C-alpha cells in the first residue's frame, strides 16, 4: 500500500501551532490564507518535495467546444485524462485498488450528476484490470487536498499572472505539465 504525502503530519503540527497561538484556523486554503501562513505552508511543502509528485493539466475552459464546456463533460474528461497519464507512470502491477480523492463538487444541485459522469469517464479511461473508488471529500477534511490546493494556486499564478514565486519553490516535484490550450485543446478533447 502506498500512502500519500508524509508532510501531512508537519501540516497538522503547524495548524496546532497556529491554534495554540490564538489563530482560529480550520484548514489551509492558499487563496484565503494570510501571507505569512501561505509562506510557511509552502516552506513545509518544499521540505518534502522528494515525497511527492505533481502532475498538472492546464486548460482554458473558454477555448473548448461549447458541448465540452458543460460541467458534466468538462471536469470528468479533464480528470480522466490527468489520471490516465498519472496511472500509466505510477500504477504498480501489484496494486489491488486505486483510490482517488477529489475535493467536493461545489455545484450542490449538480453534484450527483457530475459525480456519476466522473465515474463513467474513469471507467472508460482507467485500466480495466484495476478496481477503483472515487471519493469527493471536503478539502477541509484532508491535508492532501490542501497541499493540492497550494500547488494548483502556484500553477494558476504562474499561468494567469506570470508570478512564479511560489511555483519555483515546488517545481522540483513537477513530473508533467500538460497544456491543453486553444486549437490543440479542441483537437485533443474532441477525440473519443
What is the predicted role of each segment?
Residues 1-192:
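Phosphate-ester processing/binding pockets and catalytic centers
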Amino acid at each position: 500500500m502506498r500512502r500519500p504525502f508524509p508532510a501531512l503530519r508537519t501540516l497538522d503540527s503547524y495548524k496546532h501551532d497556529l491554534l495554540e497561538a490564538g489563530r482560529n484556523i480550520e484548514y489551509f486554503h492558499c487563496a484565503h490564507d494570510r501571507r505569512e501562513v501561505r509562506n510557511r505552508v509552502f516552506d513545509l511543502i518544499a521540505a518534502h518535495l522528494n515525497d511527492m509528485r505533481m502532475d498538472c493539466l492546464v486548460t482554458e475552459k473558454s477555448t473548448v467546444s461549447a458541448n465540452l464546456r458543460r460541467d458534466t463533460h468538462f471536469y470528468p474528461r479533464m480528470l480522466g485524462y490527468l489520471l490516465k497519464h498519472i496511472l500509466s507512470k505510477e500504477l504498480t502491477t501489484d496494486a489491488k485498488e486505486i483510490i482517488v480523492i477529489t475535493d467536493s463538487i461545489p455545484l450542490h444541485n449538480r453534484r450527483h450528476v457530475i459525480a456519476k459522469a466522473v465515474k463513467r469517464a474513469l471507467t472508460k479511461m482507467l485500466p480495466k484490470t484495476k478496481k477503483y473508488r472515487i471519493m469527493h471529500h471536503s478539502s477541509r477534511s484532508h491535508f492532501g487536498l490542501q497541499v493540492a490546493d497550494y500547488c494548483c494556486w502556484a500553477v494558476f499564478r504562474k499561468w494567469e499572472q506570470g508570478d512564479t514565486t511560489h511555483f519555483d519553490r515546488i517545481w522540483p516535484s513537477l513530473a508533467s505539465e500538460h497544456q491543453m490550450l486553444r486549437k490543440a485543446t479542441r483537437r485533443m478533447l474532441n477525440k473519443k
